[in-house]
């Protein structure tokens, strides 16, 4: 049969720019990144800069973070055991790192 995740309903929670990407692997993986790619949201409760930190990974590589101004509800949902995932929604070859990668956060029902 088809994998279980294929049958799941996904509800859009928010769309965000990728924060902090200039410090991570985005430049290295840029040629491989595509709109629609799945992103893993990793809770970093022990992050000393932001206790609501949610890291964004692509194929096991950290790309950046959910922006601090937009991460509180996402952190709470992950802490509560909700299934959230990210998807690349837009890629722009822009010198401003905040404009290069946009992604959607989806609640898996």
Which role does the model predict for each range below?
Residues 1-109:
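Conserved active-site motif detector
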């Amino acid at each position: 049969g088809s994998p279980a995740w294929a049958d799941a309903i996904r509800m859009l929670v928010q769309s965000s720019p990728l924060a902090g990407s200039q410090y991570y692997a985005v430049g290295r993986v840029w040629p491989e990144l595509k709109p629609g790619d799945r992103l893993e949201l990793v809770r970093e409760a022990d992050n000393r800069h932001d206790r609501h930190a949610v890291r964004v990974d692509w194929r096991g590589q950290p790309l950046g973070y959910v922006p601090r101004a937009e991460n509180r509800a996402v952190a709470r949902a992950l802490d509560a055991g909700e299934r959230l995932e990210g998807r690349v929604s837009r890629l722009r070859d822009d010198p401003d790192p905040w404009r290069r990668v946009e992604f959607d956060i989806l609640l898996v029902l």
